[in-house]
């Protein structure tokens, strides 16, 4: 098929061979695959000049582009022979074209494969991965079970190989590693020799839900009193390891970026005089030297992302003000690192978080590489509405020269499998001014997108990767961000490969309905950041509200741009006989019930799920049922809150009676949901919302009913609640 030694193309060829072996219609023999329909051959060209020559020879339509990631597929038909040409200007485009052909073979649609010209809609399509390195160099999410469980996987080459393979198949081309700061686990700095860390540590002690949401005090002494050494490895061996990992990524067309929060000195505190103080010149020198060494040590590192917070002293002024500190450390460190490699392509991504554009541009004016920005696109909830409004104030100040990344946070769905083509396509299509968008990275802060240690059903086997478990949603977001015009069948054709024995049309019908339940409840409840709202458990961090009560529902202000009325305003208007053009809370409840009923109706036509079975079909059907049940819970809870609000305003007892009826129904749905959820998933500690134990939360569900029974109209202060952090400052 190809004579190239390009690793990316060879991966595409490997996937073609795997697809052919798995499809009895085709028998691959070197350059030919043969079947009942005739002979098939595949040519992959990754030289633009040669590709143009072949196009002219065959009098084909010219390819639109041979730029990076672009490719054309052309087809030559002869008697009893069809040749597919993948024509590209480089290895990534060649790989993507080969993957198209592999997919067509696997899904029995090779005879339907058409000629095409392909180029990325969004040029950078990434994963946000809070990387759990070591007890001594934590990430933002380390006080949570998933990150602690995934530390050993971080140091396993096969983990990364599988991860990058899956990313490439779904057309992701950026991996962003997020750490409070990783330097002691990744580089040696000659000026600070005591800082570099050998071995990999994990505590045997338990974290709890009392840890800071700002990344502070993750080095409590008790954690170090009982440690386990997960891997004996020197810093030099670590460097070799990370070079191999970055090469693996490059071999799948994936760029590595490293993101940090600031100022954190875990692993270095107390050595050579290093402290967290912002005015400590030794700390500044260490950061600068560490950044320099990251660039010198890892030539495949594509960029560094930085955050002005959460551990910075915003009261500092003068030479130690936040942006000046970041320039002295990261800006100067990058300048040092690029001094002897001025032609290297490198990017500094400065997050808008707690920073302003004017200050960033002022302090980083002498940066010797590309400067890009980053903005929280939907704050922490990508599964809310398809057109978040928060970027709009920034758009006039951005340009193709001053682009922003989109942080697309998924702190909505940790355990479930999600599938809704229309939502994902609309979300991507609605991104405004894409010429001003550098790309996106997608992922959670409150969960680890490594291996699935949450499931109870791993049968003592190595847990599967989250990207494998949630393959359909990862496929949607990756493929549609490369090409949002892909037809639905691109995705639907994979369902019979995963679930050969069932009605795929009925499955996706129910699955799609179920997958809209969290977007609807999240846009209504709207807790902007992750610690304020987790829809799998109607929960926020205990220091915020904990479990959302029926009173809390009355007070919620829905998401900006959702066009939904909050219950307080709706109840006042109803009592006063006035109207507005917003969707009422009862419309939201009705929508949730319809989505749930549609999901359950589809399940009636499919095999009954066995919730304790680890098989993919059973677990997918089980997820759909769980979505539907919590959707019904949310519908009845909203109705109960509406009636309680009317009772509070009117003192009419029938409203209280109605509220109680709705909340009793909500309780029954929660109990059914909790049975399924707890059958599938362990009780877990999450760094952003604390412990999630849906069985234990039955007590809180009952307390809603008790609250309504005791409610005295007019004696409860009801205050609208639902502020959103400002993701952009000029």
Model region roles, listed by residue range:
Residues 1-79, 111-112:
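Acidic, contiguous N-terminal accessory segments
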Residues 8-11, 15, 19, 93-96, ...:
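Extracytoplasmic/secreted proteins, especially bacterial periplasmic and envelope-associated proteins
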Residues 51, 106-108, 129-130, 150, ...:
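Catalytic-core regions of glycoside hydrolase
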Residues 60-282, 299-300, 436, 441, ...:
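Feature activates predominantly on carbohydrate-active enzymes
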Residues 212, 444, 448-693, 700, ...:
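C-terminal non-catalytic alpha-helical accessory regions
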Residues 257, 261-284, 297-304, 309-312, ...:
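Aromatic-lined, polymer-binding surfaces characteristic
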Residues 688-730:
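A eukaryotic intrinsically disordered, low-complexity regulatory tract that is acidic and Ser/Pro-rich
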């Amino acid at each position: 098929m190809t004579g190239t030694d390009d690793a990316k193309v060879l991966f595409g060829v490997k996937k073609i061979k795997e697809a052919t072996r798995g499809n009895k219609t085709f028998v691959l023999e070197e350059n030919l695959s043969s079947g009942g329909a005739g002979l098939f051959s595949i040519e992959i060209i990754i030289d633009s000049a040669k590709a143009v020559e072949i196009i002219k020879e065959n009098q084909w339509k010219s390819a639109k582009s041979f730029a990076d990631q672009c490719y054309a597929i052309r087809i030559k038909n002869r008697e009893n022979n069809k040749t597919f040409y993948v024509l590209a200007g480089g290895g990534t485009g060649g790989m993507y074209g080969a993957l198209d052909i592999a997919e067509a073979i696997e899904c029995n649609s090779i005879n339907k494969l058409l000629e095409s010209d392909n180029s990325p809609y969004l040029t950078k399509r990434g994963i946000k991965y809070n990387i759990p390195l070591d007890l001594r160099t934590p990430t933002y999410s380390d006080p949570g079970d998933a990150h602690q469980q995934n530390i050993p996987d971080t140091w396993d080459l096969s983990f990364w190989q599988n991860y990058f393979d899956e990313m490439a198949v779904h057309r992701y081309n950026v991996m962003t590693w997020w750490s409070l700061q990783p330097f002691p686990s990744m580089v040696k700095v000659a000026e600070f020799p005591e800082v570099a860390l050998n071995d990999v540590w994990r505590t045997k002690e338990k974290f709890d839900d009392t840890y800071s949401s700002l990344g502070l005090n993750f080095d409590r002494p008790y954690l170090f009193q009982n440690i386990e050494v997960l891997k004996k490895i020197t810093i030099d061996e670590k460097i070799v390891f990370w070079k191999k990992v970055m090469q693996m990524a490059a071999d799948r067309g994936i760029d590595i970026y490293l993101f940090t929060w600031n100022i954190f000195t875990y692993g270095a505190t107390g050595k050579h005089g290093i402290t967290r103080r912002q005015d400590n010149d030794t700390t500044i020198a260490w950061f600068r030297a560490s950044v320099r060494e990251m660039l010198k040590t890892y030539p495949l590192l594509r960029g560094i992302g930085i955050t002005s917070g959460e551990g910075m002293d915003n009261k500092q002024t003068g030479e130690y003000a936040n942006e000046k500190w970041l320039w002295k450390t990261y800006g100067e460190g990058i300048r040092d690192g690029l001094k002897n490699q001025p032609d290297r392509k490198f990017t500094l991504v400065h997050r808008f978080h707690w920073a302003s554009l004017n200050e960033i541009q002022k302090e980083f004016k002498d940066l010797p590489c590309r400067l890009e920005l980053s903005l929280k696109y939907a704050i922490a909830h990508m599964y809310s509405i398809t057109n978040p409004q928060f970027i709009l104030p920034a758009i006039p100040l951005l340009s193709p020269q001053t682009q922003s990344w989109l942080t697309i946070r998924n702190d909505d769905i940790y355990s479930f499998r999600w599938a809704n083509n229309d939502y994902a396509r609309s979300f991507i299509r609605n991104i405004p001014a894409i010429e001003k968008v550098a790309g996106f990275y997608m992922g959670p802060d409150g969960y680890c997108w490594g291996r699935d240690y949450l499931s109870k059903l791993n049968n003592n086997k190595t847990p599967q990767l989250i990207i494998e478990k949630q393959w359909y949603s990862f496929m949607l977001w990756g493929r549609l961000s490369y090409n949002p015009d892909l037809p639905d069948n691109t995705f639907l054709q994979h369902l019979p490969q995963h679930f050969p024995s069932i009605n795929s049309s009925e499955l996706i019908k129910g699955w799609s309905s179920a997958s809209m339940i969290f977007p609807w409840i999240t846009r209504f409840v709207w807790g902007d950041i992750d610690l304020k709202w987790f829809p799998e458990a109607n929960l926020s961090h205990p220091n915020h509200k904990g479990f959302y009560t029926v009173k809390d529902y009355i007070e919620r202000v829905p998401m900006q741009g959702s066009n939904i009325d909050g219950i307080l305003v709706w109840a006042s208007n109803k009592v006063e006989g006035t109207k507005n053009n917003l969707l009422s809370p009862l419309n939201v409840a009705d929508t949730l019930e319809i989505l749930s009923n549609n999901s359950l109706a589809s399940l009636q036509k499919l095999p009954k799920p066995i919730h304790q079975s680890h098989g993919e079909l059973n677990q997918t059907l089980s997820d759909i049922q769980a979505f539907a049940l919590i959707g019904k819970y949310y519908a009845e809870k909203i109705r109960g809150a509406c009636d309680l609000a009317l009772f509070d305003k009117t003192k009419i007892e029938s409203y209280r009676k109605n509220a109680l009826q709705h909340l009793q129904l909500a309780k029954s749905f929660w109990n059914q949901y909790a049975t399924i959820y707890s059958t599938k998933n362990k009780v877990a500690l999450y760094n952003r919302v604390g412990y999630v134990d849906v069985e234990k939360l039955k007590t809180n569900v009952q307390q809603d009913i008790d609250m309504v029974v005791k409610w005295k109209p007019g004696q409860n202060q009801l205050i609208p609640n639902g502020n959103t952090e400002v993701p952009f400052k000029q």
